[in-house]
Amino acid sequence: MGKIIGIDLGTTNSCVAVMDGDKARVIENAEGARTTPSIIAYTDNETLVGQPAKRQAITNPKNTLFAIKRLIGRRFESEEVQRDIKIMPFEITRADNGDAWVNVKGDKLAPPQISAEVLKKMKKTAEDFLGEAVTEAVITVPAYFNDAQRQATIDAGRIAGLDVKRIINEPTAAALAFGLGSTKENQVIAVYDLGGGTFDISIIEIDNFDGEQTFEVLATGGNTHLGGEDFDNRVIDYIIDEFKKEQGVDLRNDPMALQRVKEAAEKAKIELSSAQSTEVNLPYITADATGPKHLAINVTRAKLEALVEDLVASSIESLKTVLKDAGKSVNEINDIILVGGQTRMPLVQQKVAEFFGKEARKDVNPDEAVAIGAAVQGGVLKGDVKDVLLLDVTPLSLGIETMGGVMTVLIEKNTTIPTKKSQVFSTAEDNQSAVTIHVLQGERKQASANKSLGQFNLEGINPAPRGMPQIEVTFDIDANGVINVSAKDKNTGKEQQIRIQASSGLSDEEIEKMVRDAEANAEADKKFEELVQARNQADGIAHATRKQIEEAGDALNADDKAKIEAAIADLEKAAKGDDKAEIDAKTEALIKASEPLMQAAQAKAQAGEQPQQSAKDDGVVDAEFEEVKDNK
């Protein structure tokens, strides 16, 4: 059996790691980088992922997709998606099932299908490093992801050809990376994870007892729609508004200009982590009747901080809530771990330090810790990492809708998983023959204000006065945080159960179709790569043969020369087409036609050696040499 790899599937960047001996190792991608931009571009003949996709984003804005994690498992009508529609250069559309999908070149693509392209890149990166096929992975998700978002992430893994052995929360993974092998007893850490699109805060207790380490999540919270992308968007809005004031042109209507501004805003934000000011300079950003327009705006660190201070403040509010849920005070936190690229911002570091009254650790790489932790969990599942126990929690309360539109909670938020809980309910009317079990996730008392995870019916209840039948409802949450719900009539023994697959999720048939499409695309990609190699080989042989014709000169007779040149012309014509077999055949034909050229070259070389040899012999005196030994 092969290795279980750890993948941090990020909003902005993704990272892959694997256990190498007793340590987790981050794997460099084909471009030599340790992280890969979570960007996918669809061109006329191929799908680009990572840096190659990012490089062409400006010229292909409508078909270059980024921050897809913000859409995964979300309904089209949701407030977060409607907010994104206004600022994304690509088209977000409503799927038949009500999900937020993306329209690319007339095709509707599901977020798990798009995210699978990034996972395939991570899989290939690991396979190139390990020299063997990889089929199993641990994939991380924000701790505050709901059931639909977790299911969608597992679906993305399946489409990419990966058996997702475990979904692990990002802050928990970071804690594993930080605490593995530590000999300290009973330390409580806070993991503040502000990534590209999501924010999590988890309070985790790491306990060492008799050689075994236990990582227990005490409480978790956050916001699955707050991250570096939102910080970028504040800068983008500022730049666009300033340009509109100066030039009277709104760049939001120009996708190509918007993409250029997005890149510049992200770059400016990063630069302002180390500089006090930076200039955003974009010549020829647009044009109108008066001619081309140039954008030049100075952005200071103070201005950036003013633009985003409410976002940072909202993350600090979450800190207060989670500490309270964990039953801990600020003074009981031993260490603070910062995870996610956005935590490099000085304002974020300052506000977190002010809240806890101490500086965060500087020895944890915010871009790599999550993938490393996922690889460690892969090692635990594989049996390569011993004496480590991970106890995670469910981030949101789970329950069912009961009479009066109330949510009755069966499993409280921050309950350690896996877990199972049952409760007995009854009918609301006399002689009721069926009940509908409506499964909910959230913290509101009003059922309609929570996230609906799905519903099912239990039928065949014997007629009886209201309140008499006993219906036992059981919630079962596995280690991935995925939920199974069953309802059983204790009188008749009839039972109905469902694995919660959100009504907005992909069906098994859709996933299988996407898996088949991915496999077909992989075959098409392989054929395209082989065609390119054949073209390159043909070009190289044609060029080398031409050079040899020149060098052979008169040693090559005219008929042979004409045949070789005709073969070169045939090969170059074939190389412009898409038929690899034709290119290979014409390559072989040129090699065969070039045989007289080899003979001519050899004859010319031999003819050149003869006079040189005799010239060398003229006036050469044979000498005898005596070996002198140095005895010093």
From Swiss-Prot:
One of its GO terms (molecular function) is ATP binding. Residues 601-632 are annotated as: Disordered. Induction: By stress conditions e.g. heat shock. Residues 601-613 have a biased composition (Low complexity). The modification Phosphothreonine is found at T198. It holds the Pfam family HSP70. Belongs to the heat shock protein 70 family. This is Chaperone protein DnaK. It comes from Actinobacillus pleuropneumoniae serotype 7 (strain AP76). The gene is dnaK.
